[in-house]
Swiss-Prot record:
UniProt record, GO biological process: translation
Gene Ontology cellular component terms for the protein in this record: chloroplast; small ribosomal subunit
Function in brief: One of the primary rRNA binding proteins, it binds directly to 16S rRNA where it nucleates assembly of the head domain of the 30S subunit.
Annotated compartments: Plastid, Chloroplast
Family: Belongs to the universal ribosomal protein uS7 family.
CDD domains: uS7_Chloroplast
Organism of provenance: Canella winterana
Subunit field text: Part of the 30S ribosomal subunit.
Source organism superkingdom: Eukaryota
Keyword tags: Chloroplast, Plastid, Ribonucleoprotein, Ribosomal protein, RNA-binding, rRNA-binding
GO terms, molecular function: rRNA binding; structural constituent of ribosome
Listed name of the protein: Small ribosomal subunit protein uS7c
Length: 155
């Protein structure tokens, strides 16, 4: 047995302007090459664009989008008897939020558009409405889990 203690679970800090953890999680995922100030600029511009498009609280749109994209279940490859099965597993809330943010950013990067702030704001508004590539990704994951339900006992 290890003599070391268990590592404390880190909680996400909140960002300086909105005091919101989800915004900070988004910033940390969008971050490239250590340029955090640029990541903050992109997020804050996207939030302003959401405010202009929807004329509602942009943080509620962000929360609604992330809640809509967060998966309940996913599939994990598991090797059993020489063949690999896709085994459906339940996902916790923290991991689900992380996946949702990753999917939202991936879908917004693939969008055609002027800049990342514009693409991200469009994807967040679409996800809050229940459409967009990130919602499709979640539904595809749920379909895969449903199709492989027979392998659920391999956990």
């Amino acid at each position: 047995m290890s003599r070391r203690g268990t590592a404390e679970e880190k909680t996400a800090k909140s960002d300086p302007i909105y005091r919101n953890r989800l915004v900070n999680m988004l910033v940390n995922r969008i971050l490239k090459h250590g340029k955090k100030s640029l990541a903050y600029q992109i997020i804050y511009r996207a939030v302003k664009k959401i405010q202009q498009k929807t004329e509602t609280n942009p943080l509620s749109v962000l929360r609604q989008a992330i809640r809509g994209v967060t998966p309940d279940i996913a599939v994990k490859a598991r090797r059993v008897g020489g063949s690999t099965h896709q085994v459906p597993i339940e996902i916790g809330s923290t991991q689900g939020k992380a996946l949702a943010i990753r999917w939202l950013l991936g879908a917004s990067r693939k969008r055609p558009g002027r800049n990342m702030a514009f693409k991200l704001s469009s994807e967040l508004v679409d996800a809050a409405k229940g459409s967009g590539d990130s919602i499709r990704k979640k539904e595809e994951t749920h379909r895969m889990a449903e199709a492989n339900r027979a392998f659920a006992h391999f956990r």
